Amino acid sequence: LISGHIEPTAGEIRLNGDEISGLRPFEINRRGLSRSFQVTNMFARMTVWENVRCAVLWATGHRYSFWKNVDSLPEVRERTAQILDDIHLMHRRDVPAGLLTYAEQRELEIGITIASGATVVMLDEPTAGMSHAETERAVSLIRRLTEGRTLVIVEHDMSVVFGLADRISVLVYGHIIASGTPEEIRRDPKVKEAYLGEEAH
C-alpha cells in the first residue's frame, strides 16, 4: 500500500506530509520512498556497477540508453562509485549480479534501494536465508546506510529487528498484537508467546 503496488480502498497515505494514495510506485519513489523486495530484484546479466548506475540514472532524472555513454556523466559516475564503496562491493563492480553470492546480492539490492536518496527506506526480509555471520554484516550495513533516514523493515528474525528498530509493531496472522519500544516489546507477554518463546521468560 505505502509503496503504491496495491491501491488502497479507503483512507489516505501521506509521505512527508503529501498525499500519495493512488500514485504509481515510480511516482512515490520520486517523492522520497524506496523499497526492496523479499525476492532479490535486480538485473542478473548486468554487472554490479551497471545495476547501481541504472538506479542512480533513474534517481537523477536521466534515461538509460545503451548507445549513450552514461559514464560520461560525472554526477552519475561519482554517485555510483560512492554507493559501491558504501556497500563494500567496489571490488566486484564488473561481476554480473547473477554471479554474486546470495548475501552479496542482498547487499547490492540495499545499495540500489538507497541510490535514489530516499528519506524513507522499506526493506522486506533483508536477511532471509543468510547465515549468522552474514546477518550480522547485513544489520551493520543497514544501520549505517539508513542513518538519518526513516527505516521501515519487515523481518521475522527478532534479533535483527531489535538490532535496528527504535519502534516495533508485532504482526500475528494479520493482526498487530503489540507496538512499542524494543524494551516494551521484549516484556510483552503476547510477543513472548508468539515470537520469543521460552528464552524470553
Go through each PLM region and give its residues.
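Glycine-rich phosphate-binding loops of nucleotide-dependent enzymes
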Residues: 1-201
